[in-house]
């Protein structure tokens, strides 16, 4: 289980107080075998806390927020988390009774609407009672992630953790297991639409989609006593997902840290194939990604960056008049770039990328138009990809992903194309 601790409070960032809560929680979690992967401090600001929660949700299974439960205007933790999860705040009866007792015993103390907020929890939460203060804590699960809300003062947090949170975590013999499925070539909204029925009916396991630049991931999460039990439940759900329409065509791998370039690199090594590339608009990004992996020299000997029309003719030997006739942004040029780079390096496969990164059009082609060529000893072909409404850097980045995906599809094809 990946856990993350978020300390909320501007006074932590300004150095007015030392964040001892995170150290205390990390120590206690370690005793339970819960790994703390991240610690974050954020000020009392809704927008910044929302951004931190968005990041935490994508990388952690257990998120613990400390602080921001008090009666002042800048105590926004519960309200912000409720907004993030699209849930309402509701009153906890026990916490309300504690408020009543507190002010009944102090008739001179003024009870304000802000005090009432201390007795609220997020709908669906399990309350964590506060024996040394007024702000109730809470624990809830949403989209495969467990959220815990704790008060900031150590005199309140420590008893709540020791008496409420730790017993809950330790007595829960079931652990949270997750599996990440990675998809390329399909948008998040389209994927969510296809999975609508499964998402609407989800209980355990749960399905949580995440959009990334150029791709989408789905985290499947379940609770189980052991890995084998979890795998059985996750296998069944994964099979349901992959068999919906043509989702299997977009699925390329597993894992939080995996990537399309990594999958292609592993496939090339597994099949003993070599690859080269000739790049125009991406200016070497495809080749750079290959070189990121140890052992790249086994499958990649070198390639070409032919940014201008002159270099396409000079380095690759493509007749200049042919390039002028067909244009550099064309299927013809993409095919010739791939074919010539393969012939010159004697690689098994060659990829080429030529197109319009933007923001201006080129040769009548709008920004985001990309032609990707692929050449093997069996055939040479090109595909056209439209990556509209993106920044120049995004167009180049996504174009490289499309190139890797084309290689992946070719290597996995049953038509013996390599």
From Swiss-Prot:
The lineage of its organism: Bacteria, Bacillati, Bacillota, Bacilli, Lactobacillales. It comes from the Bacteria. It holds the Pfam family CinA. InterPro entries: CinA, CinA-like_C, CinA_C, CinA_KH, Competence-induced_CinA, MoaB/Mog-like_dom_sf, MoaB/Mog_dom. Gene3D superfamilies: 3.30.70.2860, CinA-like, MoaB/Mog-like domain. It comes from Streptococcus mutans serotype c (strain ATCC 700610 / UA159). SMART domains: MoCF_biosynth. Belongs to the CinA family. This is Putative competence-damage inducible protein. The gene is cinA. CDD domains: cinA.
């Amino acid at each position: 289980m990946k856990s993350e601790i978020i300390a909320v409070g501007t006074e932590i960032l300004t150095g007015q107080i030392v964040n001892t809560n995170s150290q205390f929680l990390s120590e206690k979690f370690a005793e339970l075998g819960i790994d703390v992967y991240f610690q974050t401090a954020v000020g009392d600001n809704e927008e910044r806390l929302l951004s931190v929660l968005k990041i935490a949700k994508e990388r952690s299974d257990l998120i613990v927020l400390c602080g921001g439960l008090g009666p002042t205007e800048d105590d926004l933790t519960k309200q912000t988390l409720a907004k993030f999860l699209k849930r309402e705040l509701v009153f906890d009866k026990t916490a309300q009774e504690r408020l009543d007792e507190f002010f009944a015993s102090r008739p001179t103390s003024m009870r304000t609407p802000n005090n009432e907020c201390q007795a609220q929890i997020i709908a669906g939460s399990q309350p964590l009672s506060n024996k040394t203060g007024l702000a109730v804590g809470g624990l809830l699960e949403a989209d495969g992630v467990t959220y815990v809300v704790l008060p900031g003062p150590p005199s309140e947090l420590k008893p709540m953790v020791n008496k409420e949170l730790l017993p809950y975590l330790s007595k829960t013999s079931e652990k949270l297991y997750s599996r990440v499925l990675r998809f390329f070539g399909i948008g998040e909204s389209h994927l969510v639409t296809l999975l609508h029925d499964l998402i609407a009916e989800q209980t355990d396991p749960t399905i949580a989609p995440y959009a990334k630049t150029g791709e989408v991931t789905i985290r499947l999460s379940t609770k189980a006593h052991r890995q084998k039990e979890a795998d059985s439940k996750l296998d069944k759900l994964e099979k349901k997902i992959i068999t919906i329409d043509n989702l299997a065509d977009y699925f390329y791998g597993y894992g939080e840290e995996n990537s399309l370039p990594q999958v292609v690199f592993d496939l090339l090594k597994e099949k003993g194939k070599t690859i080269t590339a000739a790049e125009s608009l991406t200016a070497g990004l495809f080749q750079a990604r290959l070189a990121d992996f140890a052992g790249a020299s086994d499958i990649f000997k070198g390639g070409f960056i032919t940014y201008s029309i002159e270099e396409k003719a000079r380095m690759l030997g493509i007749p200049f008049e042919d390039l002028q006739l067909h244009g550099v942004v064309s299927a013809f040029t993409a095919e010739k770039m791939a074919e010539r780079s393969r012939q010159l390096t004697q690689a098994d496969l060659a990829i080429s990328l030529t197109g319009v990164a933007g923001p201006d059009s080129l040769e009548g082609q709008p920004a985001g138009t990309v032609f990707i060529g692929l050449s093997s000893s069996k055939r040479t072909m090109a595909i056209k990809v439209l990556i509209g409404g993106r920044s120049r850097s995004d167009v180049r980045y996504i174009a490289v992903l499309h190139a890797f995906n084309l290689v992946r599809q070719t290597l996995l094809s049953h038509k013996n194309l390599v």
